[in-house]
Amino acid sequence: MRCRDQALASALGEEGKGLVFVADPDVSDRWQDVRAELHEAFALTKQAAIEGEPVVYIVRGDDLLGRNGIGAAMAATALLSGARTASLEAKESAINVLAIEEQSGPGAVAAWAWHLLNSEGPRGELVRLGGSHLGKALP
């Protein structure tokens, strides 16, 4: 697990299979910082895929809409694209994205993350918590 939010990390715990990668909401607009974020996600995802483990990327829904800065938008949309592409290549691993809102509680986020990690459900999909995306142009 890679999570810098203490409350969410506590809710997620360390148990269970797979990788939960929580995008850094404070990633700067500097390309080097975005690249470092994506490099870390790639390295961890590659290891999970080799082991046949599922992956969930957690991003802020507003980052997918470009509302919180260029760096956060680049990282979130790249993770979404990466999840979709990796799902085509890593057929043994479910790789999905969970988009959360400011008011998404850590318990709800953790429950959805663990559901995606432990189900035979979607692959390469975006699951949104909340409704702030409704009525917007979506990626």
What are the roles of these predicted feature ranges?
Residues 1-102, 108-119:
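Rossmann-like short-chain dehydrogenase/reductase
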Residues 101-103, 132-133:
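A short, acidic, flexible beta-alpha connecting loop/helix-capping segment that sits on the rim
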Residues 124-139:
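Short C-terminal tail/terminal secondary-structure segment
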